[in-house]
Amino acid sequence: MSRIGKKPVKIPAGVEVNIEGNTVTVKGPKGKLTRQFPAEITISREGEELQVSRPSDAKPHRALHGLSRALLQNMVDGVTRGFEKGLELVGVGYRAAKQGNKLVLSVGYSHPVEMVPGEGLEIEVPAPNKVIVKGIDKEAVGALAAKIRDVRPPEPYKGKGIKYEGEYIRRKVGKTGAKGGKK
């Protein structure tokens, strides 16, 4: 059995779980999430725990087993604690600002780049060179953070760009002075 899949998902106090066929709805203090799970996977409630099971030991079923359990755990964590992803802007004149619910990035282009967060997502700008994406859906938080990073990914020579908090940028040595050539 999958080591991750066989662990039960604990339902904390204040969280309501509704299972209808292969659709699971989780309601908590921060919001509500609904997800459709593969038909092969069975999700059952046993007291204050959710158990995920699979029909056979076939490789696709084993993969779906662990995945489904992890997605279910992320739903429960999202509606109780929420998720956040931090980004840092590195570079002279690179800065972020919030206008209404839009994020405006000045990252060396001839124009500022505007981004609108999706539903259920929130963007904070605690400092001009720092952006925090918050939400209850881990997948959506990560996707928006990746989209912001893709506006100006970090480059390996000077390390300028938008990077995740704590991300290590592998640096390269630049070209050395002119050597030889025609006279």
Curated annotation (Swiss-Prot):
The keyword Ribonucleoprotein applies. It comes from the Bacteria. Gene3D superfamilies: Ribosomal protein L6, alpha-beta domain. Keywords: Ribonucleoprotein, Ribosomal protein, RNA-binding, rRNA-binding. Pfam families: Ribosomal_L6. GO terms for cellular component: cytosolic large ribosomal subunit. Signal peptide: none annotated. This protein binds to the 23S rRNA, and is important in its secondary structure. It is located near the subunit interface in the base of the L7/L12 stalk, and near the tRNA binding site of the peptidyltransferase center. Part of the 50S ribosomal subunit. This is Large ribosomal subunit protein uL6. The lineage of its organism: Bacteria, Bacillati, Bacillota, Clostridia, Moorellales.
